[in-house]
Amino acid sequence: MSPVASSRIEKDLLGTLEVPADAYYGIQTLRAVNNFRLSGVPLSHYPKLVVALAMVKQAAADANRQLGHLPEDKHAAISEACARLIRGDFHEQFVVDMIQGGAGTSTNMNANEVIANIALEAMGHTKGEYKYLHPNNDVNMAQSTNDAYPTAIRLGLLLGHDTLLASLDSLIQAFAAKGVEFAGVLKMGRTQLQDAVPMTLGQEFHAFATTLGEDLDRLRRLAPELLTEVNLGGTAIGTGINADPGYQKLAVERLAAISGQPLKPAADLIEATSDMGAFVLFSGMLKRTAVKLSKICNDLRLLSSGPRTGINEINLPPRQPGSSIMPGKVNPVIPEAVNQVAFEVIGNDLALTLAAEGGQLQLNVMEPLIAYKIFDSIRLLQRAMDMLREHCITGITANVERCHELVEHSIGLVTALNPYIGYENSTRIAKTALESGRGVLELVREEKLLDEATLADILLPENMIAPRLIPLRA
């Protein structure tokens, strides 16, 4: 019995190569793997992109079959291959690096070759027997990388969008719940890291929920507006060369049906092939969310600082020992990690922006970097938001006595008294308190500027944290 061959020979315009016998990709994918050893992140790292590529190929095959250009047996085999990819099979065969030259041709050929070889086996042939079903002639029929790839990127983003929104919404709800829990905890608000006026810890956390809620609403509206127009059918530059006149409409209709997304043909296929503006805007929205998350995490780190020599108004749940040399130290590792994710997303947006600007004439060859950065930003943000909610926000507790102590000893409390004792008295009390180290309330009582009943009324939390003004007595 002869040993099973460990490789097969495939050829292209540059010559021949040995392809591993068990590989469903082919020679062009192998060349790309050998050429682009850059990020170390293969296409399979982003399953939604792989699924989207398979959906594009299925839609193209359906349209070509309906138009009479693709035989039934080939259509059936391609359909089976695409269905398996959509289910999650064979994703490990998508081995090309996310960063690549060629405007995404390596990605497109990785998909074409994998689908072709799965289909060949379904037809009873062996991998590489392309005379029966060809990656270019059949799987890539009526397509160019320049319309199939950007369409798949848009679709992949849409397919993963709901998961991102769900993570953001869950984080918002966690902040909102803390807003309710801490509604009665009076504390000092701060501006420029200096004491300002009283507020509640609940108001502070509610504001976190509100600012992220704004981004949730915008992201919900933005993706359907930006990403549903596709250039599938435009082929090389948007003119539709080598495609049946009826292909574009049918292919987009089939892709919408297969994916469940409200896809529609771009109004100007040449513009849609060359312009990356939709990705720039969508990435900018992801950056905005990252900026907000980072600012919130800055606040959480400050508010939990100490525990003895910092603000120490809240306790973050301890996640791990914080130092190899300082016993007992616990660091705010979860907010710190989210800060770093935010910096990465901000950097991704800049790289994507430069790639979008780097296009020339009818095509932007930098689209692989655009795809890599935007999928990476989504993955990082989703994971960071889940981590922040699960390992930090839900376990935060308030140091109620510490919050009250800081309010009582803050010079900022004089602002609440200003309408009742006047600006000059308030300024003098504040100055004396600072110089002597005594409390504002102690000095007000000593000088009998207000009676106890009035003072107690002013100092009620509900009266200090919302608009309220009683005229000065004559």
Swiss-Prot record:
KW Lyase (keyword) present: yes
Comment on activity versus temperature: Optimum temperature is 35 degrees Celsius. Retains 80% activity at 15 degrees Celsius. Shows very high thermal stability, and retains about 56% of its activity after 7 days of incubation at 35 degrees Celsius.
Record-listed E.C. numbers: 4.3.1.1
Catalytic activity: L-aspartate = fumarate + NH4(+); L-phenylalanine = (E)-cinnamate + NH4(+)
Stored InterPro entries: ApsA (IPR004708), Aspartate_Ammonia-Lyase (IPR051546), Fumarase/histidase_N (IPR024083), Fumarase_C_C (IPR018951), Fumarate_lyase_CS (IPR020557), Fumarate_lyase_fam (IPR000362), Fumarate_lyase_N (IPR022761), L-Aspartase-like (IPR008948)
Biotechnology: Catalytic efficiency establishes PA-AspA as an efficient enzyme for the production of the industrially important substances L-aspartate and cinnamic acid. Catalytic efficiency can be enhanced through protein engineering and enzyme immobilization which can improve the production ratio.
Catalytic center residues: S323
GO cellular component terms listed in the entry, alphabetical order: cytosol
Cleavable signal peptide: none
Protein name: Aspartate ammonia-lyase
Organism, scientific name: Pseudomonas aeruginosa (strain ATCC 15692 / DSM 22644 / CIP 104116 / JCM 14847 / LMG 12228 / 1C / PRS 101 / PAO1)
Gene: aspA
